[in-house]
Amino acid sequence: TTGTSSTDRIEGMIKNAIYGIITAKACGVKEPTVGILNVDGARQTEKELKRLQEGGYDIRFTESSRSDGGCVMRGNGVLRATPDIMVMDSLTGNVMSKMLSSFTTGGSYEASGFGYGPGIGEGYKNLVMIISRASGTPVIANAIRYAAQLVRGKVFDVADAEFKAAKKAGLDKILSELKAAREKS
């Protein structure tokens, strides 16, 4: 997903993890794995997602292929597609999507990929797929197929269940604590 989560990096990354889980499950991945890209806020995001996990939210962290392991991923984890879901902030995700979809064209045309994903959020009932003016025909065709897969996978029902489970595990408390800490600083 891109740009729909939060203007706060850590809050956005936490929400992006949940949105990624929703999307993966709607696409048929029953137990998706989550990795966190090694960007500013990754360790705090990991800590908060593990709090959700300890609260009972079913989140499965992947292990980096690097010798130091852990769920915080480096660039090789991106290229190897180590996790099903690579969590990052929305701006980094946008840059990553553009680079990976247009590297064969020198950046002028997005020739591969599925666009920038669906807009996912709590209470959403309309599916909006995101593409850009540089998205080529293959990307647009893939985005349409992706949208169909999400609809067949009942993305809104999956979202309702995941948000309910995340809230039961303490999502609202975690997000309000993050907000309070931001306001103090």
Predicted regions and their residues:
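Short, glycine-/small-residue-rich phosphate/pyrophosphate-handling segment
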Residues: T1-C27, P32, N126-K154
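Long, low-complexity, intrinsically disordered segments
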Residues: E183-S185
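Short, acidic/small-residue loops that bind anionic groups at enzyme active sites
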Residues: T1-G3, D8, I59-S67, S108-I120
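Glycine-rich beta-alpha junction loops
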Residues: S5-S6, N38-R43, S65-G70, D89-G93, ...
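Glycine-rich phosphate/diphosphate-binding loop of Rossmann-like nucleotide-binding domains
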Residues: S6-R66
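Glycine-rich phosphate/nucleotide-binding loop
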Residues: M73-D172, A181
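Active-site acidic/histidine clusters and adjacent loop/turn architecture
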Residues: E177
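A generic structural motif
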Residues: F61-G69, V158-F163
